[in-house]
Amino acid sequence: MRRAMRVERKTEVRNGIKRGVFALFAIVVELIWVYIGLRNLTGEYSWIPFLIQGLAFVLVLGIYGRHINAAMKMPWILLIAGAPFLGVPLYLLMGFNGSTQRMRRRYEIIDEHLFPAMPQQGGILEELESVDYGIANQFRYLSDRLGYPVYRDTDICFYPTAEEAFEAQLEALKKAERFIFMEYHAIEEKTAFERLFEVLSERAAAGVEVRLFYDDIGSIWFIDHDFIRRMEEAGIEARVFNPMTPIFNAFLNHRDHRKITVIDGKVGFTGGYNLAEEYFNITHPYGHWFDTGIRLTGEAVRSLTGIFLENWNAIRGEKKDAEKLEEYLRLPSYCAAEPGYCQPYADSPLDGEQVGENVYMNLVNHAKRYVYFMTPYLIITDEMSQAFCLAAKRGVDVRIITPGIPDKKMVYQATRSYYNVLTRAGVRIYEYTPGFMHAKQCVADDELAACGTINLDFRSLYHHFENGVLFYRYRAIAKMKECFLGTFPQCREVTEQYLYGRTLFQRAEHCLLRLISPML
């Protein structure tokens, strides 16, 4: 078994740290100011406590009656009932925030142009229904409910390491002729990005349109405020998603966790890795970093292009750009080597649909022989937990690989708090002992798989912008299964001895963490 590598500390960009710390400090001060202000007003106006208590009662009833997951309700109900002077204003600020409503409207405007520009080709779903009606229903959910087409003429290549995926990505980028679109949660201006920047700047100089889109909080510690200017000087148009501000804004909770590269609308990459050192094991802050990726070639890349353009345009709210989507969304002429079915999809916290969770639950619920998952976090709803347990109880071989070395200790303990109920039902859980498991993928019954950015945790499933690819009957699925089978021997399987060995303090800690898990 491979030894865990020496833990190394990341190098952080100083001004990014200052900006992040200042913004967080300012937001905390604002919330404290609201709390103290309400408290002070109670001394002048005796009716204010009754108003707050009345609002607390109404809000608790309203939250309880909302058609959302029960785990999302409980923390708010306890906070509002237990500390109404804090919980009531905080919930009102979060729930009735104008910025979130404005962003939701922007996405609706973009989608009015986006989805008509990439319609479902006729006959594909009907053909899939004749092959396997149950499988077709899983694809039909994403197609009929959300508008993401199913494609045939697409080849898929699976990369069992982020290093292999990145090298293939660099080679493909060097061949770009029309445009390059890249969207990532985290960028670090070090060795890996320098290699990428060299290719991007060279293609930009050759007349290729290059766009780079990144999440501000995901990258805030690793790039400085001059990053966009430097990109523009090299001919690269860069935009930042949802910048961190010192003013309280509920939309700040929603981050862009997507990882997409599109080249000329013909080749696309996605997977778990960002553009930072640890993802390619250049540094080792958490032992060996395990990540994977996939390459799409052919028609399905159109949907990856559309997913990128949705965020790119919505963040600026530029309607004129939305009307030009068609020129980037033409189907490429491509004849695939494999007769599989491929469906890229995205998840948004603004549409009220838990797409990532529903795709995973469909995979688990329809598995007949086995279903395997890799995820860095395992913080799930009761519904997802029950799906895993029921599958195991009906004889499906359910296995989940989680990290052996955590990147966030509290989240790691929250992950472990779910082990007991799952393993008792027959789910087999493995911890990747050499380091941090960051891959987000699933394979079932040798024929169906999903790979992308979506973790098995509340933040990915409910709060972030995510993307993935669902695919059926590809050789890449066998490669993905080999990846699982090669990883299990490197893991420590969670056993009953481990579960019953928990101390009373650990049990209490796990109960508390499960209660607040929707906020982690």
Regions found by a protein language model. Give the residues of each.
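Glycine- and other small-residue-rich loops at beta-strand/loop junctions that grip anionic moieties
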Residues: 185, 376-377, 411
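Short, solvent-exposed amphipathic alpha-helical segments in soluble enzyme
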Residues: 387-391, 417, 485-486
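Helical hairpin unit composed of two closely spaced alpha helices linked by a short loop
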Residues: 367, 377-398, 403, 408
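Catalytic-core elements of nucleic-acid end-processing and repair enzymes
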Residues: 440
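CN hydrolase (nitrilase-like) catalytic-core segments centered on the catalytic cysteine
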Residues: 414, 426
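N-terminal localization/anchoring segments of enzymes in phospholipid and broader phosphate metabolism
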Residues: 1-358, 362, 366, 406, ...
